[in-house]
Amino acid sequence: MSRIGKLPIQVPAGVDVTIDGRTVAVKGPKGSLTHTVAAPIEVSKGEDGVLNVTRPNDERQNKALHGLSRTLVANMITGVTAGYSKALEISGVGYRVQAKGSNLEFALGYSHPILIEAPEGITFKVESPTKLSVEGIDKQKVGEVAANIRKLRKPDPYKAKGVKYAGEVIRRKVGKAGK
C-alpha cells in the first residue's frame, strides 16, 4: 500500500466535494477546482466527511498513481480553503517590479520593460519594488507562474542578481583571480 495514498483525506466544514465517475470537483470559500483522476484509481466518499483513494492492484504504475492522485485531491481541498502563495525576491541594481492593474511590469536590466499578465485564477501582490508574491487556489498554476517569472532573469551565480524564490539559497561562484 502506498504510504501517502492509503491516508484518508479530511474534508473540512464549508468544503463541498462531488465525485462524478473519475471527475472530482471541490468547492470551497475561495473558489472551485476540478480534477480527473487517472484510469485505475478510485475516489470514494466515506463517513464523517472523509475521502478515500484506492487502487485495484499493486502494479508499479498503479502504486505511483495512487499516491499522486491522493495528493492532487488533498491539494485541491487545501487550495479552496487556504489557497497557495509563492514569494519571490528581486535583487540587483535597478531591478524592480511594479503593479499595473492586475499585471506586473518588471525592469530587469533589459532595454525594455517586461509585462506579465495574470492568468485566470492567479493574483499578484507587490509588497515592495523588490518583493512580490503569486497567489491562487491551484498549487500547480501558482508554482508554474512563479517559475516563469523567475525564468525572466535567473539568479546570477557570481553576484546573485536576478529573480529568486524567497528563502532560496543561490550557490555562489568565485570570480576569476585578479593580479
From Swiss-Prot:
Looking up HAMAP family in the UniProt record yields: Ribosomal_uL6_B
Listed under subunit, the entry gives: Part of the 50S ribosomal subunit.
Gene3D superfamilies per the UniProt record, alphabetical? Ribosomal protein L6, alpha-beta domain
The UniProt gene name for this protein comes to: rplF
Q: Listed GO molecular functions?
A: rRNA binding; structural constituent of ribosome
What keywords does the record list, in alphabetical order? Ribonucleoprotein, Ribosomal protein, RNA-binding, rRNA-binding
Q: Which GO terms describe its biological process?
A: cytoplasmic translation
User: What InterPro entries has UniProt attached to this entry?
Assistant: Ribosomal_uL6-like (IPR000702), Ribosomal_uL6-like_a/b-dom_sf (IPR036789), Ribosomal_uL6_a/b-dom (IPR020040), Ribosomal_uL6_bac-type (IPR019906), Ribosomal_uL6_CS (IPR002358)
Q: Know the name of this protein?
A: Large ribosomal subunit protein uL6
Query: What family does the Swiss-Prot or TrEMBL record give for this protein?
Result: Belongs to the universal ribosomal protein uL6 family.
Source organism of the structure: Streptomyces griseus subsp. griseus (strain JCM 4626 / CBS 651.72 / NBRC 13350 / KCC S-0626 / ISP 5235)
Role, per record:
This protein binds to the 23S rRNA, and is important in its secondary structure. It is located near the subunit interface in the base of the L7/L12 stalk, and near the tRNA binding site of the peptidyltransferase center.
Q: Which cellular component terms (GO) are annotated to the entry?
A: cytosolic large ribosomal subunit
Instruction: Give one Pfam family.
Output: Ribosomal_L6
| Keyword Aminoacyl-tRNA synthetase on entry | no
